[in-house]
């Protein structure tokens, strides 16, 4: 095997943007930021919460529908 070809595998802190929870894991990255973690995820907490990404999907679908309609009219 070749020596010194593997990335450094160190302990990093993972930060949750939603609830502010932090925990330590190991990774090749310097730091990790997640949108939602097991501390605030609805599946693990049993509480229903709104996730911001749903609005982004709806916005994308609206834009795509407009462009598809304009392409259909052009033909």
UniProtKB/Swiss-Prot annotation:
Keyword annotations from UniProtKB, A to Z: Ribonucleoprotein, Ribosomal protein, RNA-binding, rRNA-binding
PROSITE patterns, A to Z: RIBOSOMAL_L31
Signal peptide (residue range): none
UniProt-listed InterPro entries: Ribosomal_bL28/bL31-like_sf, Ribosomal_bL31, Ribosomal_bL31_A, Ribosomal_bL31_sf
One cellular component term from this protein's GO annotations in UniProt: ribosome
A Gene Ontology biological process term: translation
Transmembrane stretches, start-end: none
A GO molecular-function annotation: structural constituent of ribosome
Protein family per UniProt: Belongs to the bacterial ribosomal protein bL31 family. Type A subfamily.
General function of this protein: Binds the 23S rRNA.
HAMAP family named among the record's database cross-references: Ribosomal_bL31_1
Subunit field text: Part of the 50S ribosomal subunit.
Name this protein carries in UniProt: Large ribosomal subunit protein bL31
Species annotation: Chlorobium phaeovibrioides (strain DSM 265 / 1930) (Prosthecochloris vibrioformis (strain DSM 265))
Source lineage: Bacteria, Pseudomonadati, Chlorobiota, Chlorobiia, Chlorobiales
Name of the gene encoding the protein in the UniProt record: rpmE
């Amino acid at each position: 095997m070749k020596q010194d070809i593997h990335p450094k595998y160190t302990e990093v802190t993972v930060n949750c943007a939603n609830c502010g929870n932090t925990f330590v894991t190991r990774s090749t990255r310097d730091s990790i930021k997640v949108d939602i973690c097991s501390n605030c995820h609805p599946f693990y907490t049993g509480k229903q919460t709104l996730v911001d990404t749903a609005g982004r999907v709806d916005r994308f679908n609206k834009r795509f529908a407009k462009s598809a309609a304009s392409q259909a009219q052009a033909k």
